[in-house]
From Swiss-Prot:
GO BP term, pick one: 7-methylguanosine mRNA capping
Binding site for S-adenosyl-L-methionine: K14, D54, D82, P83
Residues under site feature: mRNA cap binding: K41, Y269
Reaction(s) catalysed by this chain's protein: a 5'-end (5'-triphosphoguanosine)-ribonucleoside in mRNA + S-adenosyl-L-methionine = a 5'-end (N(7)-methyl 5'-triphosphoguanosine)-ribonucleoside in mRNA + S-adenosyl-L-homocysteine
Positions of the mRNA cap 0 methyltransferase domain: 1-277
Family as reported in the entry's similarity comment: Belongs to the class I-like SAM-binding methyltransferase superfamily. mRNA cap 0 methyltransferase family.
PANTHER family: MRNA (GUANINE-N(7))-METHYLTRANSFERASE, MRNA GUANINE-7- METHYLTRANSFERASE
Listed CDD domains: AdoMet_MTases
Keywords assigned: Methyltransferase, mRNA capping, mRNA processing, Nucleus, RNA-binding, S-adenosyl-L-methionine, Transferase
Any Pfam family: mRNA_G-N7_MeTrfase
The keyword Nucleus is assigned to this record: yes
Annotated protein name in UniProt: mRNA cap guanine-N(7) methyltransferase 2
Amino acid sequence: MAVTPHHRLYEFAKTALIKIFAFPYATVCDLYCDGGVDTDKWGDAQIGHYIGIDASASGVNDARELWESRKKLFTSEFIELDPSADDFEAQMQEKGIQADIVCCMQHLQLCFESEEHAQKLLNNVSSLLKPGGYFVGIIPDSSTIWTKYQKNVEASHNKGLKTVPNSIRSENYVITFEVEEEKFPFFGKKYQLKFANESMFENHCLVHFPSFMRLAREAGLEYVEIQNLTEFYDDNRTQFAPLLGGYGSSLVDPRGKLVARSFDILGLYSTFVFQKPDPDAMPPIVTPELHDPENDQEEEWLWTQQASMDDGRVSRTDILPPADNEKGILGPGPADMRL
């Protein structure tokens, strides 16, 4: 069976995120490891130890069997626990597990079926991470999805229709909400996603980003970034265009820009990054990023401000880059699709 554009784009996004955050000999904990499908990506990043956690025995066994069948590039262990239901702290302390990176690449949104499940997952993440460690992954971009849905609702009202639509359609996918409603509940907003040329629906929940941030903060995690995948790609296009091209020449144009189909599909997802504070670390928390020559103008501005600060004329709050009104946690996503 041919690999669909959706799967190729998603695999690219995971690979790119791992390339940014992984480093040699790191300890990585993969929540809902899904049969260990990403172990090769972590191996390419030269990590030292991999911990695969899944809620199902089959997921854990499949991950272990896959790892055992491959070249052993790192040590590993596989644990059957539900990150959104079980209490990790006592069990992991007994094992002495502390991770540099905790990732959740494809299941976090289902934890937002209830506040209790989301809270449990984030508390578990915090207990797993070393001070200074990162929690990273990919989730549906609920801002983009909900704004598309609201546009459908508005259009139906303008047409004088009494019923509220329960779906979003494009050439590439159909999103169907279980309940027709015009409000965005913080938890439990379920929907099904079906991509063109795929027979199966995916079940998801919308992730209310402010609630995500609040629960993470209560669990002891600092918000770093939530970014729509189209922006994530554009910000790192110089580095990642060849990588994405390797997943299929039809995904980007000759200049490395996303073609319309790729933009539409990637726009449904966001990366997320949180960090567990390290009280002994200096300087303050920053987002790891790859150098992009297209950002040289901003870097020149920062150097200018740094020179002024060295002269004693600029305070710390004055040296932040100019605010970008097109980006923000309450509305990540394509510029015309923000709350």
